[in-house]
């Protein structure tokens, strides 16, 4: 049986790690596999350098935004990553909507997207207790080709 390094969602096989010829880079990948909070720009560059991204499982995630931003996303054909290097996503649609509602928007649009699990990691810059959920980050732009469903929502009380 092949040894696997588990990062909650991100897995490396021995063959994948064997591609990483630089010892320091391999060590960094293993450290990130053991502690996902260590994932950084260096990790992303190593993954890109050795073509380790687009393999493995995919899961559905949700990205919420305002209607205005949703229109721009559809025009541009992409959900662009932010200044912090990724696109914030959640595992449930209502969780994603909370991040828009907290900014004073009672209505919005939710994009359900299918993404490579290897490009997703927990974002530790959000207070889980405050938001009532974990936030995740996808480490690249999300082309609208990865959108499976678009829904409008409202948090207004009737």
List PLM regions with ranges.
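Short, intrinsically disordered low-complexity segments
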Residues: 89-107
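ADP-ribose/NAD+-binding catalytic cleft of ART/PARP-like enzymes
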Residues: 5-85, 101-102
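Short, flexible beta-strand-to-coil junctions
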Residues: 64-70, 91, 113-119
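Active-site and NAD+-binding cores of ADP-ribose-processing enzymes
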Residues: 8-32, 40, 80-82, 104-158
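Short helix/loop capping segments that flank catalytic or ligand/cofactor-binding pockets
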Residues: 72, 97-99, 122-123
């Amino acid at each position: 049986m092949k040894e696997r390094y588990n990062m909650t969602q991100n897995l490396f096989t021995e063959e994948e790690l064997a591609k990483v010829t630089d010892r320091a880079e391999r060590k960094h990948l293993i450290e990130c596999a053991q502690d996902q909070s260590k994932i950084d720009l260096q990790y992303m560059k190593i993954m890109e350098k050795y073509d380790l991204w687009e393999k493995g499982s995919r899961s559905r995630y949700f990205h919420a935004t305002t209607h205005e931003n949703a229109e721009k996303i559809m025009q541009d054909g992409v959900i662009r990553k932010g200044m912090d290097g990724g696109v914030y996503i959640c595992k449930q649609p209502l969780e994603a909507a909370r991040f828009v509602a907290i900014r004073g928007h009672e209505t919005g649009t939710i994009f359900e997207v299918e993404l490579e699990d290897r490009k997703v990691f927990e974002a530790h810059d959000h207070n889980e207790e405050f938001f009532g959920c974990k936030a995740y980050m996808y480490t690249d732009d999300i082309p609208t080709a990865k959108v499976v469903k678009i829904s409008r929502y409202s948090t207004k009380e009737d």
